[in-house]
Amino acid sequence: EPESIGGTLERFGRVKLNRDPFSARAGEYVVTVTGSIGAVIPAQSTFKSDDTVINSGKLFILDSAYTLVATTDSITIRALEAGNDSKLNIGDTLTATAPIALVDSVVTTSAETIEPSAEENIEDYREKALDAYRLEPQGGAATDYRLWSADAQGVKQSYPYAKTGAVNEINLFVEATIADSTDVKGTPSALLLTDVEEVVEFDPDTTRPTYERGRRPLGVIVNFLPITVLNVDVVINGFVGLTVDIQNAIELALIDEINLVRPFVAACDILDEKNDILDSNKIISIILNTRPGSVFGAIVLNVGGVPYNSYTFINGNIPYVNSINFV
């Protein structure tokens, strides 16, 4: 359990992961400003995201003074609130909270230089700690790529596979945490993939000598790839005695169980925990476990828009429950 309730999770995590759970990370953004050449934007100037943007009313600060060298120039501002609640999109506008001489008060987001990240979920930290104890470093085997990927904030899991038909080439599929994904389904951003590449190349532990921090074996090519989310649609025919409460209970149970299905990597996963197949029998079992004695007709399962009786999730494919219908 976490130390906050008297447990020892973080203490054990520090031994293998060499860190506590990641704290939320504040985003940094390049914004376009207009004004007179030579105008100075003072350090600590503050900008507030406008009401028209998705995360409105958030404050951002300029850490160092900047002198405009062109009538249209750029500065880098940092969110005062860490996490995704202060995330900006390209094109979002902000307004200075106080007038700045010879500078337009409205600025426009043009780039994201540091991606914000949510605080690491304690269950994700627990899973990474367990993996760190269970998986032994092997100098470039599949287990190493999974362990190394866990050093990048925002990674929920990674799935390393040897690339078919290639020698010394790895496809490393990266799944983001829900909070840090681009679609709230697990798809990582390009910046997160870059972060994973950095920790696979080089150990982020700065207490170690530089010559000991290299990770990727010489001559090995690693392709850093996003997972692919496949929509899962389930149709349950002819359920007898269906009520709203029964329907809600079954839907929640199906969502919970289907979301646990993940690709199996033989080189670093435990065979007894293999859970990569979704089929009609599994859906029937979930329904009967949730509502014993249920009577219903045929189950129709679609994965990625294609009907299947059974589907095995491999490589970077993961499921997302798109719809559950009772007809």
Indicate residue ranges for each PLM-predicted region.
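An aromatic-glycine-centered, glycine-rich loop/turn in mixed alpha/beta architecture
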Residues: 225, 245-327
